[in-house]
Amino acid sequence: MQNIPDIKQGPISVDAIYEIMGAAMNIPSVAKGQPTQFVVLNQIEALSKASEIVPVPPFTMQALAAIVVCGDKDKAQEKDKWMFDCEAASQQILMTAHANGLGSYISAIYPHHDRIEGMTELLDLPGNVVPHSYVSLGYPAHVPGARDAFSNERVHYNGWVRRKSTF
């Protein structure tokens, strides 16, 4: 799975959005209390305004939907752990979009104060809800080949040792 560099026009089905949302909502919660909240943007005007707040590559301007992943600090039973749930939900969105034939691109909102403030105002979020990430969705014009970032040098067993496992 990787970011898709070109998105073609075409509406994203409600069923695909619901499947993506279902996967994102079913993550294990580190913060407990399921503090993740989601704002689906599917109107051109809202997408355009959001792209002025969160830097996105030009190709994402063709996306016909985006999901803003937010954390509700009041629902997080463990303070400041809401962001971990948002990160896991964002990853689920990327993976489920890919499984549904969609391309996706993720942009960080949190911890950038200007982006948080701008998105909070645009979406009229209550004070306890913090926007975390912005995921653009669209059908890929072409799918690049799979990328393999595996490196044995990044794997350590039983401590910071650079050697293969004895398994």
Predicted regions and their residues:
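Acidic, surface-exposed loops and disordered segments
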Residues: M1-F167
